[in-house]
Curated annotation (Swiss-Prot):
Protein name (record): Probable Xaa-Pro aminopeptidase P
Cofactors, names only: Mn(2+)
Domain of life: Eukaryota
Family (UniProt): Belongs to the peptidase M24B family.
GO cellular component: cytoplasm
Gene for this chain: AMPP
Catalytic activity: Release of any N-terminal amino acid, including proline, that is linked to proline, even from a dipeptide or tripeptide
Alphabetic keyword roster: Aminopeptidase, Hydrolase, Manganese, Metal-binding, Metalloprotease, Protease
Binding site for Mn(2+) 2: 413, 424, 536
Gene3D superfamilies assigned to the protein according to its UniProt record, in alphabetical order: Creatinase/methionine aminopeptidase superfamily, Creatinase/prolidase N-terminal domain
Organism: Paracoccidioides lutzii (strain ATCC MYA-826 / Pb01)
Function: Catalyzes the removal of a penultimate prolyl residue from the N-termini of peptides.
Length: 616
């Protein structure tokens, strides 16, 4: 990870700020759809700061610059930021939030500028209130100043073809999904829903794209009313098959006309009020993640209602076809990972091959690509050896990465997009003799992963409540990890999917776990400069039978679908309970039963799998 000299970029940005009478300028990570993962053309925060992580906000004043990010990226940011930048570590008590730091720069009635398409309406209101206390004000600038600094070197916006996602994998037609959405909107007396999140649009219309790396989505907006369905998309992205799929039930409109139409909808709603209609006017709904600019186009906070997206809620509860697809693709994916780990061990120990982290991950992609229904990777593979494994979201660069050390911990976090599902698996291995500390750390993390997997809890329980199940064994030793325990996973969609998850984020306390949710289970431990441990399975929430049923409500548990062995060499059986040993042995028996058939003619992998799945 190289440090980028940002001095000239900051100087140019400050000149533009001065011209526009802006004292502080905000550069969020997200695009105009509030996507976590973005297209290269939207990488403004990375361009101005040099920090390439997926989360964070850059704040630039006329004399200072700060970058705020969460615990996943503290190590990475400290390496990538040059001396122009102060790192604000989110969640650390001694550190101000980026909003507080911004307010500190504003004495004397200064102005904070931001592109209103890159910040949510609720965040804009909250920030405005914070900076008002320091005498400052928030100004939305329609032209993005970082884009002006970037100039002709900024990548162009992708315009790749959209494809139909077959109903055999989707499990429900797009017409049924729109009908369900309309019923939900009618219950809440809404005039309609303006859809801005890209994965929600892809899911709703049973379409997939390729505009953002690793995420099968496409740039679009949609407006759904009781009688109309409008899709705002560049028409050259649509094939004849896609147009036939949508038929006459969906009106196609230019992507750029969304704000003009939103403004017209807002004015139409106001006209109804002025006309003296007897019933209260129905408001349009937008997601709480919709942009400030979209809210303003519809008339502002008094004219629209910001809600947790009903599409997000529906999408998170997978139907039977999606759940079956998840089971199937994880078996194939687990077989690919097993083949890769067997190959890697053989290359390092028997052939004494010198491999770097990227060469190894390239081999994994090659193996995966041969699996049925493979489309591509679901995120950049984290292939990390030794101290690099302590960088939670490490990215090995092709011309600047480490040789894999057989005598050090190797952490591999990887996933793929298949037509029938999305995978995300982490395994930590050791090809030599691990230290006692490495074995203890691994086993404590494993115990936490098993605790989530085997949890039984009443309906209505949130991921916030479950988080301590995973951390308890580390906490007893005074250890912890600075990331969430689990995130929602899409079905041939984004590998990080809301609104559910397991962790300490406020949002995880708001939405309970429901049957049909697909979530990662991935506790970890990281010792900077030395090693990192993470173990990740994908689990699916389901109703379970219990001896009793207190409160006469359903009880839930999890079904794991990830099928690749855990690391025997790093596991210390003396730290495991009898129940945990039984779980590991049963899990490994399941892995053998479901994946060994892939290796009937592959003796190397079959022998490795048999060895790794023996009872402990």
């Amino acid at each position: 990870m190289e440090t980028v000299d940002t001095s000239q970029r900051l100087a140019c940005l400050r000149e533009l700020m001065k011209e526009r009478k802006v004292d502080v300028y905000l550069v969020p990570s997200e695009d105009s759809h509030q996507s976590e993962y973005i297209a290269p053309c939207d990488g403004r925060r990375e361009f101005i700061s040099g920090f390439s992580g997926s989360a964070g906000c850059a704040i630039v004043s006329m004399t200072k610059a700060a970058l705020s990010t969460d615990g996943r990226y503290f190590n990475q940011a400290s390496k990538q930021l040059d001396n122009n930048w102060l790192l604000l570590k989110r969640g650390i008590e001694s550190m101000p939030t980026w909003q507080e730091w911004t307010a500190e720069q504003l004495e004397g009635g200064k102005v904070v500028g931001v592109d209103p398409s890159l910040i949510t309406a609720s965040d804009a209101r909250s920030l405005s209130e914070t900076i008002k206390k320091s005498g400052g004000s928030l100004l939305g600038l329609q032209e993005n100043l970082v884009d002006l600094v970037w100039g002709k070197d900024r990548p162009s916006r992708p315009s790749k073809k959209v494809t139909v996602h077959p109903v055999e994998f989707a499990g429900k037609s797009f017409e049924e999904k729109i009908t369900d959405l309309r019923k939900e909107l009618e219950k809440k007396k809404s005039a309609g829903f303006v859809v801005s999140m890209l994965d929600e649009i892809a899911w709703l219309f049973n379409l997939r794209g390729n505009d953002i790396p690793y995420n099968p989505v496409f740039f679009a907006y949609a407006i759904i009313t009781p009688s109309t369905a409008d899709l705002y998309i560049d028409e050259d992205k649509l094939s004849a098959d896609v147009k036939k799929h949508l038929g006459d039930k969906v009106s196609l409109k230019p992507y750029t006309s969304i704000f003009e139409d939103a403004k017209a909808l807002g004015q139409s709603a106001q006209a109804e009020v002025n006309g003296g209609a007897s019933d209260p006017p129905r408001k349009f709904f937008i997601s709480t993640k919709a942009s400030w600019s979209l809210s303003l186009a519809l008339g502002g906070e008094n004219k629209v209602e910001e809600v947790r997206s009903p599409i997000s809620d529906a999408k998170a509860i997978k139907n039977d076809a999606e759940l079956e697809g998840m089971r199937a693709c994880h078996i194939r994916d687990g077989a690919a990972l097993t083949k890769y780990f067997a190959w890697l061990e053989n290359e390092l120990l028997n052939k004494k091959t010198v491999l770097n982290e990227v060469e190894a991950s390239d081999k994994l992609e090659e193996i995966r690509s041969k699996q049925k229904n493979f489309v591509g990777l679901s995120f950049d593979t984290i292939s990390s050896s030794g101290p690099n494994a302590a960088v939670i979201h490490y990215k090995a660069e092709r011309n600047n990465c480490s040789i894999i050390d057989p005598e050090a911990v190797y952490l591999c976090d990887s996933g793929a997009q298949y037509l029938d599902g999305t995978t995300d698996t982490t395994r930590t291995l050791h090809f030599g003799e691990p230290t006692e500390k490495e074995r203890k750390a691994y086993t404590l993390v494993l115990k936490g992963m098993i605790a989530i997997d085997t949890a039984i809890f009443p309906k209505g329980t949130t991921g916030f409540s479950l988080d301590t199940f995973a951390r308890q064994f580390l906490w007893k030793e005074g250890l912890d990890y600075l990331h969430g325990t689990g995130h929602g996973v899409g079905s041939y969609l984004n590998v990080h999917e809301g609104p559910i998850g397991i962790g300490t984020r406020v949002q995880y306390s708001e939405v309970p776990i429901s049957a049909g949710n697909v979530i990662s289970d991935e506790p970890g431990f990281y010792e900077d400069g030395n090693f990192g441990i993470r173990i990740e399975n994908i689990i699916m929430a389901r109703e379970v039978k219990t001896t009793f049923s207190f409160g006469e409500r359903p009880w839930l548990g999890f079904e794991h679908v990830t099928m690749t062995p855990l690391c025997r060499k790093l596991t210390d059986p003396s730290l495991l309970s009898d129940a945990e040993k039984i779980w590991i042995n049963e899990y490994h028996n399941e892995v053998w039963e479901k994946t060994s058939g892939y290796f009937e003619e592959d003796e190397l992998t079959r022998n490795w799998l048999k060895r790794e799945t023996q009872p402990i």
